């Protein structure tokens, strides 16, 4: 602001011509090159220099002829400079009068509004445009032209107009466009560089340029595999062939090229393949079906070729493909071409024009029905070995194998655990042992006990206990009688599975549960077993009706009815156990829509008859053994969880107490008539004996240990 004050003082004290000549002759070059340097401060100085110069131009013509308007403005200026500014800006025809312009500039300087004048800024831009030659050669030429025009008296006339330049309204849009154009160009450059790198390094990035390396030393042996003796026996032939191929080929025979291991998850298919490699002592190539697919077309087929090429160099060897159904699924004409390329290449490598000698391919899958028929035909996968879930002896062996790594107490009986885990796979048994070990560690025990194994088994089979669930006393009592009815009918029904455990502790989605386990592995079920299963299923609802009445039954038996109906319908439609329908199998998967109305009606009548008979049988048993039912329910309310052995012990004690009471009542009836005093003594003695027996039974019942509490 200092330079502006200097110009204001000069305007008041010196003639305009002198100021103009001094500015023109002594102007510094750095003021005229403000645009070149680009600094914000220099640019402002240049603009303000031009503004002051315009004021000097106006004051330059003070000694010329003064019209009446200019004289009037001069007189007004002495008393009211603001009025001069208002008059000049409101009268456009005064803008061409040099004397009036001089008075206007002096008034702006007087009131210190020189920088805020819109009119002066417009005049300054007009001088810059009219004096420029192309792209802003310099501010000095504009100032010279403006000064010369002022000297000649033609500034603001028709021959030398004041040009108006408006700022571009599309400046922001142009900036956005330039930014977008720069980003697009950058993206194209990066994409091009990436494509070049990808073209040269895609094989290295996807691992295609690296040769597949086998596992040379497999530590797994057949002795480590338990519970699948039949599968091990079939795979031993492969081991003998890999050890001595000439033994089998000198007679003209050919060993199978491929072995397909089929079975449920967790049965040890992968472990069997590793055991084959460990026993034979040959290189072992392992891969998964999903590893062949990639986002790039043709990568899967390329990887199959690389795998078999590496295997040929190390023949004899084993190639193991886990989850082969990922690439070996049945082909569909609607599938994309790249989806079939991998499978086609695998088919060619297994049995194509070029024979692969000494390469044994072992594949594993859980869904053999989904594989392509061309893949499983003889010549590719000649042998299909089923690896089922282990039987009771196999489960015991698997448990022993896993328990070798765990500290166990002397009370552990693995045969009991094996018998109580039907349908468990090897992976399930390994998980059971691990859960038991973690439970023992959490309890601070020094070894895994039988209770830990039982806890792990119940947690896997029945779900975790929900002891924090808030249940009313009425609901607990109803659940105890409901589950007690199931257990009691199972004990007194011929053909029913033995009761393993009864509990009223909520597990999973149930409020209580009675677990029944077979004494041995079962491959089929008899009619007697199925009818007994129906009786046990109906016992829960029967118990609720007998104890609480018809109006107090609950929805807790819904799952029992659903399972019983499913079993009864299977007996009628699948197993030929209905005299009315005969030995005919009916497809009921479509809800009977494929059958006639008469047939469906007959099936439903037979199913209803089976369920009604089961209901009546359960009602007869619970009515006959009502006292045992009450004792068992009270024991469940007290201990919450009871094992099968504990339930039998409680029922035996209840029966013994009842028999003693019956004998005590019948004894006086059989005794001959005697004097009143001896008879009274005998009666008192019998009553005392009965009371003592009842007290003893109650004490023994309280001594039963609760497992789930």
UniProtKB/Swiss-Prot annotation:
Coiled coil: none annotated. InterPro entries: AAA+_ATPase, AAA_lid_3, ATPase_AAA_core, ATPase_AAA_CS, FtsH, P-loop_NTPase, Peptidase_M41, Peptidase_M41-like. It is an enzyme of class 3 (hydrolase). Its main location: mitochondrion. It is found in: Mitochondrion. GO terms for cellular component: chloroplast; membrane; mitochondrion. Its EC number is 3.4.24.-. Keywords: ATP-binding, Hydrolase, Metal-binding, Metalloprotease, Mitochondrion, Nucleotide-binding, Protease, Transit peptide, Zinc. Probable ATP-dependent zinc metallopeptidase. PANTHER family: ATP-DEPENDENT ZINC METALLOPROTEASE FTSH 4, MITOCHONDRIAL, METALLOPROTEASE M41 FTSH. This is ATP-dependent zinc metalloprotease FTSH 4, mitochondrial. It comes from Oryza sativa subsp. japonica (Rice).
